[in-house]
Design a protein with these regions (language model features):
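Glycine-rich FAD pyrophosphate-binding loop
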Residues: 23-47
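Short hydrophobic core segments
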Residues: 7-9, 32, 131, 150-166, ...
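An anion/pyrophosphate-binding glycine-rich loop and adjacent beta-alpha core
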Residues: 36-38, 43-44, 52-59, 92, ...
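Glycine-rich active-site loop/strand segments that organize a redox cofactor
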Residues: 49-95
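N-terminal Rossmann-like FAD-binding beta1-loop-alpha1 element of flavoenzymes
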Residues: 4-31, 388-392
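Feature captures the FAD/FMN-dependent oxidoreductase FAD-binding
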Residues: 76-154
Length: 392
């Protein structure tokens, strides 16, 4: 039987940060993962360049039933702390937009940095390792694994959520939480594209690959970024962002011309260019194909002088407030994150330790904390992993 001080299950972003930090303060750490490679989500993130944090991280960028839970960890390990580690290792990076930091080269720069840090402090990493059972001891935990039996003082669950099962995502962390008496908040896919099945499907298919700067709103939340038309429906950063606030049956409102006061713009065009066709004017804002499709699908395109005031108002309403009721989302298959999870009211916000079972910790995406798109979920992984490592 193997004995150690800390066992961390899950060698993703949160697990790696927790391991290197705990071992760095002298703890004997065993890091286990059922996959054949550590940090798979790190490697595929940001189109292979890893959007590893956001310069503007603050608690307001996170969704949780307990809005205050993330504050302590985010304050104690900030984006600047992680940027400092990146700089120490000489990993070149840049800001893409909106505070989003990406590697100049490839995501593996971040993974190699974390693995090097783990090596330097003696973390024992074992991949292709499954956990059969976990049992609470008088002091600590007993794990039955494919490595054999392992005992530990502290057990950290860093197994992530259900998003992107092809990378090995499972509900293991939720099973452990349930086993030790924790409530789970309902889970669903977040930061995920919408599917469309009504008459809009044909429009989306025709425009597949077209990207447009929009203001997208739902349930009192709004995001100004691009939307992307796809064969299945709608995607792009603004759609992924709003998907975390959308519930089945909700209407999503899309302003296709956020830089314009659309009614005034149309009236101005009617006054100044009365002989120009609507599709010609829209072609100066959108691609010609999109302008033609919108004009053909939504309006009867004719010279501006032929529209009545009522028709102009209806066109403005459609362009500035296009209402879409998605059929659903693409689900966990393509979702970047999982909403819901372990109820944070049953976990210490200071230590990440279970309030139900001493010595058990939960970090990262397995908890009911979900960041906006743009590096925030990685920052939660770093911060929650660091917080737990101070006490595990």
């Amino acid at each position: 039987m193997r004995s150690t001080e800390v066992v961390i299950i899950g060698a993703g972003a949160a697990g790696l940060m927790c391991a290197l930090t705990a071992a760095g303060r002298g703890r004997k750490v065993l890091l286990l993962d059922h996959a054949n490679k550590a940090g798979k989500k790190i490697l595929m993130s940001g189109g292979g360049r890893c959007n590893f944090t956001n310069m503007y991280t603050e608690p307001g960028n996170f969704l949780s039933q307990n809005a205050h839970f993330c504050k302590s960890a985010l304050a104690r390990y900030t984006q600047w702390d992680f940027i400092g580690m990146v700089a120490k290792h000489g990993v070149p990076y840049h800001e893409k937009k909106l505070g989003q930091l990406f590697c100049d080269n490839k995501s593996s720069d971040i993974l190699e940095m974390l693995l090097n840090e783990c090596d330097q402090v003696g973390v024992s990493l074992h991949l292709d390792t499954s956990i059969q059972t976990i049992e609470k001891l008088e002091k600590g935990y007993l794990l039955d694994t494919t490595l054999g039996q392992v005992t530990c003082e502290s057990l950290v669950i860093a197994t992530g959520g259900l998003s992107i099962p092809t990378l090995g995502a499972t509900g293991f962390g939720y099973q452990v939480a349930r086993q030790f008496g924790h409530e789970l908040l309902p889970t669903r896919a977040g930061l995920v594209p919408f599917t469309i099945t009504d008459q809009l499907k044909e429009l989306c298919t025709e425009l597949s690959g077209t990207s447009v700067d929009c203001l997208v709103s739902c349930n009192d939340q709004s995001f100004r970024e691009n939307i992307l038309f796809t064969h299945r429906g709608l995607s792009g950063p603004a759609i992924l962002q709003i998907s975390s606030f959308w519930e089945s049956g909700d209407t999503v409102e899309i302003n296709l011309m956020p830089d314009h006061d659309v009614p005034s713009w149309l009236q101005q065009q009617q006054a100044e260019r009365p002989n120009s066709e609507l599709k010609t004017l829209l072609g100066e804002i959108f691609t010609k194909k999109m302008a033609n499709l919108l004009a053909d699908n939504w309006f009867v395109s004719k010279p501006m002088k032929q529209y009545t005031h009522g028709e102009i108002a209806a066109i403005a309403e459609k362009l500035a407030s296009w209402k879409v009721v998605p059929a659903g989302t693409e689900g966990y298959r393509t979702a970047e994150v999982t909403l819901g999870g372990v109820d944070t009211n049953e976990v210490s916000s200071k230590t990440m330790e279970s309030l139900k079972s001493p010595g058990l910790y939960f970090i990262g995406e397995v908890l009911d904390v979900t960041g906006h798109l743009g590096g925030f979920n990685f920052q939660w992984a770093w911060a929650s992993g660091y917080a737990a490592a101070q006490y595990a």
